Structure formats: C-alpha cells, structure tokens
Amino acid sequence: TVKADTYLINPAGDWTLGGLDADSGLSGRKLVVDAYGPNVPIGGGSFSGKDYTKVDRSGAYMARKIAVDLLKYHHSQEVMVKLAYAIGIAEPVMALAIIDGEGHDLLSSNYLDYDLSPQGIRLALGLDNYHFVDFSTWGHFGRHDLSASWC
C-alpha cells in the first residue's frame, strides 16, 4: 500500500496525444551521458529531441543552476538538487537539495527565490535565446563555450 498526503492520477486529464506531438522526445539516447554519467540519478526523460517547455530538459537545467548557486552560497563540497513534476501541474511536487549529505526541502524553506514552473524556468534561464542543436554534440552541462546560463 502506498501512503501519501496527495495522490495525483492523470492531473492533466485524458492522455490522447502521442509521438512527436506529445512529451516523447525523438530518441531518448545518451540519457546517462547527458546527465553527468552514473553518479547522478536521472528520471528517465531525455533532453535531446524535446523542446525546453518539457521539464525533462528545462527542469534538469534549472536543477543544475540551483545546485551551482547553492554550492557557491554554502561553499559546499557537493550539492545535488532533485526536482519532480507531475504532468499538468506547473510547480514541482518535490524540490530537494542535498548539501554535503544533508537534505533540505526547497518547497517549504526560504532557500529558493526561483519560479520553478516551466514558464518561470524559461524566463530565468533565457531559454528562448539558445540553439539547442549546439548541445547535442558535447553535452548540456559545463559548456562554457556556449555561455549557457545553467552551466
């Protein structure tokens, strides 16, 4: 039995679209490589083949930005940020930062001054200004040659 405060069952309504018209992405390849290798857990959604309105891609970029910001702020050795979204819900259902092994609930604290909705992420990271084909070759993170706001 799964116990939770809230159960979200098809919060966006009927799921009638599929393929390239929906949230499927093109290939789904290189998931682990695109997300730091095997050291960082991934949700299974690919970046390439999806536009940045999909939180598989933009949420990962925002998690990276938040992790780097918290790393600098706390002068930490390691920060991992986990964001979880439900289809049809604009805000994340979970936002957790693990800072040097200690967990912090980012939704119930004053750690964040970020809008974590897809629209908020788009604006905060300036995602309208990038040509994402540039990221498909050498990765999505740590690309100082592309001056991405989340790198």
Segments from the language model and where they lie:
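Conserved mixed alpha/beta catalytic, RNA-binding, or beta-rich assembly cores of soluble enzyme
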Residues: T1, W15-G19, S24-E78
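Generic structural signal for short, flexible, solvent-exposed coil/loop and linker residues
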Residues: A4-T6, W15, L20-A22, Y36, ...
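Short, ordered loop/turn segments at secondary-structure junctions
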Residues: A12, P38, Y52, L83-A86, ...
